[in-house]
Amino acid sequence: MVIIGPRGPGSQRLLLSLLLLAAWEVGSGQLHYSVYEEAKHGTFVGRIAQDLGLELAELVPRLFRVASKRHGDLLEVNLQNGILFVNSRIDREKLCGRSAECSIHLEVIVDRPLQVFHVDVEVKDINDNPPVFREREQKVPVSESAPLDSHFPLEGASDADIGVNSLLTYALSLNENFELKIKTKKDKSILPELVLRKLLDREQTPKLNLLLMVIDGGKPELTGSVQIQITVLDVNDNGPAFDKPSYKVVLSENVQNDTRVIQLNASDPDEGLNGEISYGIKMILPVSEKCMFSINPDTGEIRIYGELDFEENNAYEIQVNAIDKGIPSMAGHSMVLVEVLDVNDNVPEVMVTSLSLPVQEDAQVGTVIALISVSDRDSGANGQVICSLTPHVPFKLVSTYKNYYSLVLDSALDRESVSAYELVVTARDGGSPSLWATARVSVEVADVNDNAPAFAQPEYTVFVKENNPPGCHIFTVSAWDADAQKNALVSYSLVERRVGEHALSSYVSVHAESGKVYALQPLDHEELELLQFQVSARDAGVPPLGSNVTLQVFVLDENDNAPALLATPAGSAGGAVSELVPRSVGAGHVVAKVRAVDADSGYNAWLSYELQPAAVGAHIPFHVGLYTGEISTTRILDEADAPRHRLLVLVKDHGEPALTSTATVLVSLVENGQAPKTSSRASVGAVDPEAALVDINVYLIIAICAVSSLLVLTLLLYTALRCSAPPTVSRCAPGKPTLVCSSAVGSWSYSQQRRQRVCSAESPPKTDLMAFSPSLQLSREDCLNPPSEPRQPNPDWRYSASLRAGMHSSVHLEEAGILRAGPGGPDQQWPTVSSATPEPEAGEVSPPVGAGVNSNSWTFKYGPGNPKQSGPGELPDKFIIPGSPAIISIRQEPTNSQIDKSDFITFGKKEETKKKKKKKKGNKTQEKKEKGNSTTDNSDQ
């Protein structure tokens, strides 16, 4: 039980002091519990709340808690029932070691008032640790001469438990040589010992393995064991002995000096020095001044120490002995009989003279390489010598005289296949057994320049980014020559040719020794997409041989050209363009179209359009097509809209980084009926000085005059046809095609058949004109009876050379209605140049080069991008004058009709009939002009 503070009678002052002590000072009290180690989690220890005199309901309010400086997580209190329980595994040996007493001290703290209680929990030991030995095996050396009752101490076991659980008992496995004895030391600890009860013999039992077991006194008992390995030490009590009392050996008289005669073998059952044997020769009979034999003292190997001669001695008797190294030493004896046989003991001799080396690989068959002579000191059949040569070689031996031979060339040589030959000349006598001798002849083959340098492949493809720095290393060619030395020394050079107007050497160079190819100047993808040339490799032989390899260098495009705005009718790209727009137009009305080109290709030439932030306001009713460049109204115009708008259109490509240009469009809003009959661009020039038109060139004036004349004729014919039409034909019904006129430049045709039109009092039906190339033959029957199927695009429509530089413009792709993926950009389907499109859908022209499609023709196609879907027999809103880059949209408007829309148009000044050289010069001039206009436009921003 816990005694909380001393109690007794006292005055009021004493009671007050006790209350203060209870509230502010630490109260004292102590509890004692016990628990066994290794108890499971949740094991009951004691009702600590009840023993401390605390109610269960006040444990939480008074912040009942257990604090311990060490091992605080081993025990825990359940605040619901006030029971102290085991929280985690308790290991007494880890907690207290081998101490006899082991307890866990806890401090229990409660507040309101503050009280501290001390709790000691005794940890009781259980037999959870078996006795163990420090090592798994103990080695005990014992001499075989050790006397009986000899004691050999062993290392005892240890038990981590205490008390009875640590009391140990030893037991030894059964054997006839040793018994176990327990020795008690001064500290009351016990030590096991082995006592020898029977003498040992190492030759019979060199080792003895015993098992020592130990048992503790716990319940249940735990055991341990250790292997006892007894090694019996040797004593020199045995002498060496040979495996045979005598040996017999037969030798030929021609055996070489130091030849092994026999290997003797003696054994000693002892070990160590007692078993180490040393061999020696005691006597050799017959006695001679020269010792003909020697013996190795360590191995017992007998070798010849001189030359045996059958004519001198035909037999020898060798007496040998073996002595161990024990103390005292012991010896064994034996005898070796050697019999000598008479044989053919003289070998032939071979001599090679007059060598002609090295041999040229182009040497003639039959060329003498060397002279060979042979001899043998024997006589008779033993002295007759026959020579032979290594087989399967391009050489042979030719006998020239007795015992003389010539080594000659038998077949053609090839140094690249075999550069040297190791020939073996064998001379064999006629003895029995025959003797032979060999001589080696090394024949080197000298190189002849018969192999040209060879490349790994006949052609290489190299990719180089444009705008590379001068002297840039772009590739390395390597050729291999199978010849040797200077015949294999390869040098590289360019195979000179013309690349356009320049020499190949002005573009690239090749290092003569390394084969590295360098670009001498920055390459321009727009000027040169593919550079194909050959590199020659020649060796230094006489005469030199060579070969060529082809290199195809593709110049990869980089975004180094900003979008260039196509020239306005005034003749300057990037200048302000004025447009007049009636206020009565509805949403989606196209005001103008911005046209731009990019000299790059691929993504670098894919253009997008957007209004500059300065031009985008909350009330500006205009929007530009992302990929079409068409500026259209976003809503119906009203009186609140400003009469004039200055729009800045940003044209941006998709390169990395993107390059931009800016176009300025001036839009003036006019009331209905106030639009002048002349071109909106011309009228705006009088209103706004910034949009004033420049002088129109002579060709444009002539074209407009011709078109105006044709327009008047068309109107007259149209009026006649309308008056003669049946009354059943509605004003909005499709009309029949009518042939207007025919001229040297083509046929002009008018069509209203199958035309989807809108009947409106404000906007009467409009008629379209279109110009076809002269190759299109139209008859009146064709015009009056259009085919039921849609017409295929005319393959004769072509862009002139003056606009070849603009073939990469993505705006033309958008005009053609081919950007069907919307803003998806890269997912769009690029148009082809085929004129056999099965079902054209919209009246625009599509550039075949804008997205990397290589062609110089423009094909008329229909697509969903056209706001008006024409019927199969109808003509589009725009026409192309053959031989001119202009795309002209001409519509016949009634007197009070409003101007529908205007386009940015370009008229070329170069004719297709000019020479090719002049075309290139004109294209370069126009490209420079467009770049200058782009720069001017950027400065306007």
Swiss-Prot record:
PANTHER family: CADHERIN-87A, PROTOCADHERIN ALPHA-12
UniProt-listed PROSITE patterns: CADHERIN_1, CADHERIN_2
One Pfam family of this chain: Cadherin
Annotated membrane topology: Single-pass type I membrane protein
Species the sequence originates in: Homo sapiens
Residues in the signal sequence: 1-29
Stretches for region Disordered: 818-941
Positions of PXXP repeats: 734-737, 790-793, 823-826, 863-866, 882-885
Glycosylation sites: 257, 265, 548
Sequence ranges assigned to domain Cadherin in this UniProt record: 30-133, 134-242, 243-350, 351-455, 456-565, 581-678
The protein's name in its UniProt record: Protocadherin alpha-12
Ranges per topology, Cytoplasmic: 719-941
Gene designation per UniProt: PCDHA12
Location within or outside the cell: Cell membrane
A biological process term (GO) from this entry: homophilic cell adhesion via plasma membrane adhesion molecules
Feature: compositional bias, Basic and acidic residues: 900-914
Transmembrane segments: 698-718
Lineage top rank: taxon: Eukaryota
Residue ranges, annotated region (5 X 4 AA repeats of P-X-X-P): 734-885
Keywords: Calcium, Cell adhesion, Cell membrane, Glycoprotein, Membrane, Repeat, Signal, Transmembrane, Transmembrane helix
